[in-house]
Amino acid sequence: MARRGRVQLRRIEDKASRQVRFSKRRAGLFKKAFELALLCDVEVALLVFSPVGKLYEYSSSSIEGTYDRYQQFAGARRDLNEGSTSINSDENASIHSRLRDITAWSLQNNADESDANQLEKLEKLLTNALRDTKSKKMLAKQNGEGSRSRANSSGSRGQEEGSA
């Protein structure tokens, strides 16, 4: 049995062919949305605007209710991000301050002429600053991944339909 080749993704130039393809793909997308809602017991809302601006919509419940839920989720996520941004800016200011102190200390105490004790002190400061930076980086990565996984599991479903 012959396999079909991959469909090359590019704009279809012929207007009639483009309209036929749009209709078929739209029907397939709506069928998938229905199946997803039915099989997985999830809330799905799908809005599609045709090239001429006609609206096609599907919702497993109500579009308005789903949109309201999305707005609440997006608002809570935005508030969370704004709160973490202010915390991060305070932490960044602290790190920059420590870095300025270390730089000033190393300039004052010319590292080439320093004794072993002074160099050990500088090494300890730099090691601590590096450790703190790495831990903050790890925490930021974990928070970023956590918010993405929460977004995928708690109701943000627009990304999955758009990427299909």
UniProtKB/Swiss-Prot annotation:
Residues 2-62 form the MADS-box domain. Pfam families: SRF-TF. Its main location: nucleus. It is found in: Nucleus. GO terms for biological process: flower development; positive regulation of short-day photoperiodism, flowering; positive regulation of transcription by RNA polymerase II; regulation of transcription by RNA polymerase II. Probable transcription factor involved in the regulation of flowering time under short day (SD) conditions. Functions as a promoter of flowering under SD conditions, upstream of EHD1, HD3A and MADS14, but downstream of GIGANTEA (GI). May transmit a SD promotion signal from GI to EHD1. Functions independently of MADS50 to control flowering time. Plant over-expressing MADS50 have an early flowering phenotype under short day (SD) conditions. This is MADS-box transcription factor 51. It comes from Oryza sativa subsp. japonica.
